[in-house]
């Protein structure tokens, strides 16, 4: 009967530690920036591990700014190459998971209201379910035409213009169809997710103002201790007062920056005021550029890892 108490103490200790992180404004290091964008840095310790991170806070209603995404159209480019190809945006950050073999994005990407990439819709079952398929609904963050952000669990269909969104919870379903439709999920509580810009990843970290890490429900990394591993991380969320929060955490440098667990990442996003938040691809992919300058140091041995998609903040022309 003592275990729940121990876990509760750990949870509150972790929450207290993230709340005590010492963030310093770093706008001047990445100038010039509009008044609606601020950059913060932190070089501290977190739960006994060295910690380095940066985050940006961007006002969504600033009509001088454009929030968009771009893909490599079957190729992969480094964030710096996207910065050059996209004519020097204010911000570039990695986002979706992908295949190293095919360069395919494995999550939804929406640009100008058009889906450029789709989620994985079926995964082969294992063990007793080896003859079945799992149908994951994975997290994404989007911004609509009114510049309102949302995080939802999605099912995508390349024959449909919009993703199917589940706002209350991820759907966990399985069946015999290798190419499922929305009806394979046996859930009618969905809506069309009409976003102008969106990027996918997973798992969701915060839902309706509370930590809810849904990596098991999203069927991410089954069998791995993904939740408890210290890794470089990228996350994106939004606040109730209309600010987009983009977080990049350095890692895989034990004496300099250890990275964080998913629980720690969620606590950080909550402490930054996020009402909802999403984990994005991390590890060697984590990279955040402000005005073309690196914030965290990427952990990939070659430097910035080429990725097939990025999220961008640009000047609105």
What are these regions (language model features)?
Residues 102-128, 220-275, 280, 285-317:
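Conserved, well-ordered active-site substructure
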Residues 103-225:
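Active-site-adjacent helix-turn-beta-strand microarchitecture at beta-sheet edges
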Residues 50-55, 138, 200-202, 231-235, ...:
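Short glycine-rich loop/turn motifs
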Residues 21-44, 151, 212-213, 293-317:
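Flexible, D/E/H-enriched segments
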